[in-house]
């Protein structure tokens, strides 16, 4: 192989990066869908189940990130990305499946001279046992050039990417990540406090008042139930849309509370 051919090959390689902690429930199924990528990196936060045994079975590259008191995976994202050796990185959660069509699309994309430096990938999610239209396309910024990307250690943070970012059109129904987690009402309500706490930092400069407590939850509900088609999902869709409104109400309330505390 000539030096030019080697460089060309290196430019068209993809590392799949997965952060794990006690992820044995779905990990084997996930790894089956990504095993044919150029590299699979598992960044584990000291799992106590057989997560690492599964990763070794599939020949994954394994790095360990000390869990400490962390309850989220974001602090370990950058460690996982840095452990990858390929130019391009696809970040996949330990409960997300990658379709053959998505894989083909990504390899085709990086072969183009005008390929973007980052790509939003749509994701299908479940609630109360069924796919939810009100969540879709739930875009995730998961594909990018490794050396041009930094991932903040903040819950639900998007990576910071140097360069142009594009989206896979939501109409490509065969390309979304398939999120296996089947969220129940209890699990989603249990996450509200954790997730909305992050909204305080993200939106600390927003001057929300009483009006925002009314219109923001309503807009969130309307978008989920009407605009995104939650009405097609029956009672589950209505409950899901209500949850979206409740989430927004709690988030705005916390932002207002934080501002009031700082004024005292």
Task: Report each predicted region and the residues it spans.
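Short aromatic/hydrophobic "clamp" motif used to bind/position activated sugar donors
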Residues: 89
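Catalytic-site signature of metal-activated, phosphate-bearing donor transferases
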Residues: 74-75, 81, 92, 99-262
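Conserved donor nucleotide-binding strand/loop of the catalytic core
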Residues: 52-85
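Short, well-formed alpha-helical segments that are part of the catalytic scaffolds
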Residues: 17-36
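Short, structured coil segments at secondary-structure junctions
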Residues: 36, 57-59, 139
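Acidic helix N-cap motif at the loop->helix transition within catalytic regions
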Residues: 25-28, 49-58, 101-102
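A conserved acidic beta->alpha catalytic loop
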Residues: 33, 44-53
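Cell-envelope/extracellular polymer assembly enzymes that use nucleotide-activated donors
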Residues: 13-15, 39
